[in-house]
A protein has these predicted regions:
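Short, surface-exposed alpha-helical recognition segments that flank or form part
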Residues: 19, 33, 118
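Conserved phosphate/anionic-ligand binding catalytic regions in large, soluble enzymes, centered on
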Residues: 17-20, 62, 67-78, 234-248
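A short, structure-level motif marking secondary-structure boundaries and short turns
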Residues: 5-6, 60-62, 111, 231-233
Length: 249
């Protein structure tokens, strides 16, 4: 089996770190696969999203639980700045506790659900509440589990577009890595200002850069891990707030 970050497979497995290392390592490859997949699925999502995004009254709500909520918090400021659209990010636990505080029945709403498992009760309940309370509710579901309740919800409704992230993104480790970055990237590509074609060159550059960094940064990361620190603090503002929250896990 493959070695990751210069650690052999047996060493990683003995320390229950195999999945985590593999899922961190594979991310640039999955990003490239995600772009190809979205191109192949354009006939599925473009007719759904295009008329919604053309509506100046549209409110976009990015939501999820835990790390999935952090993905929305990281992306919302960037989308607001780059597109001029009304974009907010809320945790599904907050929406479920007081939906009328976050969902505006006076405006058409696109609820973007980030979900690794797609089965968490609060994520499913948020979708159901939106359909109950909003006259114009639409759902873009970005999930990693094709058999999840959220993924299946799209088969029952006409106001839903469900996209499953590339195979391998449904992380097996406790921490979300590939799932987090793939869902966040897919939302940026689908809702951002650039077309898929225009985004391809910068995405390819990012993929190649990260493939290089996962090799070249190993000595610095290992030295930092061996330095004996007892506390790890992440800082960030605006887009980096959600990333800092996720990194602290």
């Amino acid at each position: 089996m493959n070695a990751y970050f210069s650690y052999e497979a047996d060493w990683l497995k003995q320390r229950n770190a195999w999945h985590t290392a593999a899922e961190i390592w594979q991310q640039p490859d999955l990003w490239a696969a995600l772009h190809r997949q979205l191109q192949d699925q354009q006939a599925q999502w473009q007719p759904f999203l295009a008329p919604l995004l053309a509506n100046p009254r549209l409110q976009i709500v990015l939501c999820g639980a835990g790390s999935s909520a952090f993905a929305g918090r990281a992306l919302a400021p960037w989308l607001r700045e780059r597109t001029g659209r009304d974009v907010a990010a809320y945790g599904t636990t907050d929406i479920v506790a007081n939906p009328r505080q976050y969902l505006d029945p006076e405006r058409p709403t696109l609820l973007v659900s980030f979900a690794r498992s797609g089965n968490s009760p609060e994520s499913v309940a948020t979708v159901e509440l939106a359909d109950q309370l909003l006259p114009e509710s639409y759902h873009l579901m970005l999930v990693c589990n094709p058999d999840s309740r959220l993924a299946q919800y799209a088969h029952q409704r006409g106001n839903v577009c469900s996209l499953v992230m590339p195979q391998g993104s449904n992380d097996q480790s406790f921490a979300m890595t590939s799932s987090f970055s793939c869902m966040m990237l897919s939302a940026a590509l689908l809702l951002g200002p650039a077309s898929l074609e225009a985004a391809q060159a910068p995405l390819n550059a990012m993929v190649q850069r990260c493939r290089t960094l996962r090799e070249t940064l190993q000595p610095q990361v290992k030295a930092l891990a061996a330095s004996g620190f007892r506390r790890y603090i992440t800082l960030g503002g605006s887009c980096f707030t959600g990333l800092a929250e996720e990194a602290s896990l």
